[in-house]
Amino acid sequence: MTAFQRCINPDCGHTFDLLEVHHSCPDCGSLLDVDYEWDKLPVPKSLNFFEDFWGCRRIPQRFSGVWRFHELLPFAKLEDCVTIGEGQTILQKADFVAPYAGLKAGSLFLQYEGLNPSGSFKDNGMAAGTTHGKLVGARHTACASTGNTSASLAIYCGVTRMMNAVIFIGSGKIAYGKLSQALDYGAKTIQIEGDFDDAMARVQEASKRLNLYLLNSLNPFRLEGQKTIMFRVLEALRWEGPDWIVVPGGNLGNSSSFGKAFIELHKLGLIKKVPRLAVINAAGADTLYRLYEQVKLRWNGGHWDHDKIQKFYDQMDAEGRRASTIASAIEINRPVNLTKCLRALDFCNGVVREVTEQEILDAKANVGVGGLGCEPASAASLAGTKKLVAEGVIGKDERVVCILTGNQLKDPNATVAYHGNNKEFFESVLGKRGVTTTEFANHPITVANDIEAIIRLLK
């Protein structure tokens, strides 16, 4: 049993067979990790080992940007791993936007996950999650989603034909770009009266009662796949870690998986330097920011303060606070991976910040002008970087990697409202959320249907 599941609570620490299916630890209710007996596995002596697979095209799994790192997530045989070509993403040096963030040239990099098959980072995790589903013989799978998870699950089920997908979404809480993907790929779509947090609660209940294989990031195998985003970042930087990884924070699956990646790489002696981690909430969905920076909730060696969390949620419910942000992918008030994220922040000496809708949209416009258009949630990473540089937390010459989680076609309304000239549309999409200026907008220009007028304009 070289791969198994382990409860993250050190006071429990119970282990479970690889082929058992649990949403959380049956004994104490804590989250589960996928763990390995590394001393019994053929671990590479150096990360340079993976360079041998850069040009591999004949073996689909080695072409995958997830499974070519199979030795670092070896819970399934390579030939059993599910892939639809995910992980062909790039780390782009971003001198064009570094001044906006307050960084010197050569310091800022953008990890663009919008090149994945469904257009977001979720495909990294879905490749691993559906692989475990295949191992346990799942035929029906489900998720709750703000949009990207549903699109990813739907495309994997549609392409592989292994499982039927059911997705739960909140009423009016999903961008049409993402919803269209799930519908087009054939997923059964259940729209409930509520938001993502409500949908997440209902999908867990339905999964238990109907034996649906749950593929939210509560599933520890999802997070195994998302570790590979960090492997590709290191690969692009010639295996030298950056000073900072900055990532948007929603359900906290990415930040949790990044932390696990660095914990394991360090334990295996494959890296010495551990990057610092910054997780960026939207101000309208800032549970992690409030708990970490204000309430001072910490990992504390795995002995996190349950009472602080429960008290926070009780007060949130009493006040009727609901997540609300244009960055729909991170519009979440009850992040299921909260405790794993605390572990990542602890190991990576991390910080948490919140950014406003205005800061997100301005950052998004600055990313877009360089050709790497992103959805609003992605831009939270750049907005957070700008804030941390202004605070002096990030040095102007430190090497920073911002994770762009999804492409701009995921939520075109925000883009059109920001850059367009329709004041009524702007107000309905952005103005009501506190966005007042469009300093970096690329407004379309209206001109008469006359070639001379067009020529004069272009001159």
Protein language model annotation of sequence segments:
Residues E205-G269, L361-V367:
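Active-site/ligand-binding-proximal alpha/beta "capping" segment
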Residues E357-N413:
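Claisen-condensing/thiolase-fold acyl-transfer catalytic domains that form or cleave C-C bonds
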Residues G194-N211, E264-G373, Y418-K459:
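Active-site/ligand-binding loops adjacent to catalytic centers
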Residues R62-G137:
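Positively charged, low-complexity intrinsically disordered leader regions
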